[in-house]
């Protein structure tokens, strides 16, 4: 069989470069406190300028809470076209329903493959190395303040 000669398709790297402004990535970061409680920091990162767009802190993330946070992260039709995320169970039906109503195309990564979401993992690693490894977090309010200062730095 003769192979068809068509226009060459673009590579994944070219696609990401061309659509970087329309892609955002999200992830949850676990932060231990001084009293050995676990806090969860929800981080939203824009691919275009690799800018921290939104963060929120909670003790118990739920699908409804994440749906509200994604609405607050992208108000007034500022939502990206694509949202890259991991396959955490906390992203439930309420969250995916909210993405559909906002017109965001959900792109979950493969299970157990954090390297498919490198920008979010790099942000979390940098946040830990530059900030959280040097600060003892007391409570949610303290973590919000630390993230506010870090977002100005990042």
Where do the model's predicted regions map?
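Charged DNA-binding/catalytic regions of mobile-element recombinases
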Residues: 1-154
């Amino acid at each position: 069989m003769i192979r068809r000669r068509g226009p060459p398709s673009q590579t994944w790297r070219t696609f990401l470069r061309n659509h970087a402004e329309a892609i955002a990535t999200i992830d949850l970061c676990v932060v231990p406190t001084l009293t050995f409680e676990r806090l969860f920091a929800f981080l939203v990162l824009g691919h275009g300028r690799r800018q921290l767009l939104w963060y929120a802190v909670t003790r118990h993330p739920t699908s409804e809470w994440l749906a509200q946070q994604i609405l607050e992260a992208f108000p007034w039709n500022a939502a990206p076209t694509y949202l890259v995320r991991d396959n955490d169970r906390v992203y439930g039906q309420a969250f995916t329903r909210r993405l559909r109503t906002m017109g965001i195309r959900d792109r979950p990564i493969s299970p157990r493959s954090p390297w498919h979401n490198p920008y979010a993992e790099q942000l979390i690693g940098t946040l830990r190395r530059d900030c959280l490894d040097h600060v003892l977090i007391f409570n949610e309010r303290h973590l919000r303040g630390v993230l506010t200062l870090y977002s100005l730095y990042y």
